Amino acid sequence: MEKFTQKWAIVSLLEDVEEGSEFYFTDFPLHVTLAGVFSTPADKDQLVHGLAGLLRKQSLIEIEADEADFFGPNEDIPVMRIKQSGELKKLHLQIHDWLTSLHVEYNSPQYQGSGYHPHCTVQRDTSLSLGEQRVLTSVSLIDLFPNNDGYQRKIVKTIQLG
């Protein structure tokens, strides 16, 4: 029996998905991860208000799909790496520093902060193409344990950029 606990992630969705939407973990919309899976003693309201304050003056960020690759312990998760721009790195580090102040524990801390590798995981029905350019227009807080269900995901809050 798997044991699930409250976890969160912060992403920039590349598809239009309404705030409050729930979906099965295998149906995650196309996105760029800005903060990987984490737990924290902070509650949902603290996360929502803190993230909104942090992003208050954040401008849109242009991204470009740079290289196909495989992630994961078995290198079997197909991803499209995103070119690491100064703006994207700065956004990740701002989020990382803020989360550090909330005493988060990451599932994979080696990929946060200086170990951040921006990417877009290939989803069932969609992915980025090599060289494809997009604009990050929002940042979303994702609940990875809505209604005590570790297989569901919920978009708790989406904050528009720019």
Model-derived segments and spans:
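Extracellular/luminal beta-rich ligand-recognition
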Residues: 73
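Basic, often amphipathic N-terminal segments
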Residues: 1-64, 70, 85-143, 155-162
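Short histidine-centered catalytic/ligand-binding loop motif
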Residues: 76-87
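A two-mode feature
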Residues: 148-152
